[in-house]
Structure formats: structure tokens, C-alpha cells
Design a protein with these regions (language model features):
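Short beta-strand->loop
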Residues: 23-45, 101, 134-152
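An extracytoplasmic/periplasmic, membrane-proximal ligand-sensing/linker region
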Residues: 160-220
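A bilobed periplasmic-binding-protein/Venus flytrap-type ligand-binding module shared by bacterial periplasmic
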Residues: 49-60, 153-166
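Short beta-strand-to-loop elements that line the ligand-binding cleft
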Residues: 3-8, 98-107, 145-148
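Extracytoplasmic
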Residues: 1-4, 9-12, 21, 47-49, ...
Length: 220
């Protein structure tokens, strides 16, 4: 349908729409990077990572140690909470769907809390989801560690209808970049979407998402 001209699409939704010739990427969101202690860095990045968290006292020292353990995952459409962790653990010899017990979670915060409560042995979440539960779980950074970080995952897109003319695309690009620079506009995109800025993007930035989606389908 041609009702929507512009959309904020996460990576997987964008690749599906693009491959059906329905959407083209216009811009990619920038967010603050993450320091080792989980705090925001001053640097803006156009991608982020997924992390596998375990308790420090769990005795889990390597990916291989995850076999037979319980892992908290998000819905199958989640890039950071499902797709990327599954593929990267599989590369290291652990097929999550066969070698582990999967516990489905609604929300990355819930996954971290389940790990803290001992309901699961590991949690696949975005880096660093621990900071969103720190208020309720003040010891989260002391008691957990990152077992593995994935390859970078592209941030959300601003995508447009694939038949939109280039002049209008350029106007939209400028408009979104300008909005991000105004005080009021920045406040909205930061509070609603956790976006800080927008940069030009191209379709090939999302090839890794296609590759990983394909690999997950082959794993089942």
C-alpha cells in the first residue's frame, strides 16, 4: 500500500520492506555509544551491539559453557535480543535452539531482571541494557558480566516509499537533520526514539541484517 510516505523502521523491518521494493533507506539514527561501565559515551554512533550477560559467580567463562543452560531471549523479530545473539553463538558452536533452554521475555529490562533473580543463566540484550534496570537493581554491574559482544547492528532507519522522487527525498533528509539540531526537535526524538541525530545511509549497511536473518531461518 502507498499510504505511508515516511517511516521509522528498525533494521529487520527495513530490509523486509526494501526487498519487497516498498521502501528505501534515507537516514540512519545516531545514538550515544556505550562505555565499558555501561554509561553513555560522548561519541555518537550509527550502530550498537548486542551482549550476552551472565552472573559473575555463575562459573560460565566461555560461550561453550552455555550448553544446557537457560537463556532469556526477546521475540524472534528482535535484532539484538534474538537474531544477532543466535547467529554469533552458533558460530562458536552453541546452537541456542538445540543446546539451550530458551525463555522468552517481553523487554530487555525483564531479561536482565530474570538473570539477576536467577531465573535464567544468561540474557541476550542490547549493550548496555543493564543501565535501564540499575535504579531497581543497583548491584547489576557488580554482579553480572558481558560474556560476549556481537558485531555492530545498524541503528533504526528513516525510510521512504521506494517511488518517492529524489527532490522530495533531499527535502526530507534536510528536514530531519534540521529537526535534530533544534532544541525542541532534539528533545522529542531523544525522548521518544532515543535518537540523537541523523546521518545519510545506504542499503548495503543492512546486508549483515539480511545475512543474519537468513542464518537464523536455516538454524530452525
Amino acid at each position: 500500500s502507498k499510504k505511508v510516505d515516511v517511516g521509522f523502521l528498525p533494521p529487520t523491518a527495513y530490509t523486509l520492506a526494501h526487498d519487497q521494493k516498498a521502501a528505501d533507506v534515507l537516514l540512519q539514527a545516531q545514538r550515544f555509544g556505550v562505555n565499558k561501565d555501561g554509561s553513555d559515551s560522548k561519541e555518537l554512533t550509527k550502530d550498537y551491539k548486542s551482549e550476552i550477560l551472565v552472573k559473575k559467580d555463575s562459573g560460565i567463562k566461555s560461550v561453550k559453557d552455555l550448553k544446557g543452560k537457560k537463556i532469556a531471549l526477546q521475540d524472534v523479530t528482535s535484532t539484538a535480543g534474538y537474531t544477532f545473539p543466535l547467529v554469533e553463538l552458533d558460530k562458536e558452536g552453541v546452537n541456542v535452539l538445540k543446546d539451550m533452554k530458551v525463555v522468552n521475555m517481553k523487554g530487555h529490562d525483564q531479561a536482565v531482571i530474570s538473570l539477576m533473580n536467577g531465573d535464567v543463566d544468561a540474557a541476550a540484550v542490547f549493550n548496555d541494557a543493564r543501565k535501564i534496570v540499575k535504579k531497581d537493581e543497583p548491584k547489576v554491574f557488580d554482579e553480572t558480566k558481558i560474556l560476549k559482544l556481537t558485531k555492530p547492528i545498524p541503528n533504526d532507519t528513516i525510510s521512504v516509499r521506494s517511488d518517492m522522487d529524489s527532490k522530495f527525498r533531499d527535502k526530507l533528509k534536510k528536514a530531519f537533520k534540521d529537526i535534530a539540531k533544534t532544541k525542541e526537535g532534539h528533545k522529542v526524538i531523544s525522548e521518544v526514539y532515543s535518537h540523537e541525530n541523523y546521518v545519510d545511509s545506504k542499503d548495503e549497511n543492512f546486508d549483515i541484517v539480511r545475512e543474519y536473518d537468513k542464518k537464523v531461518k536455516e538454524m530452525k
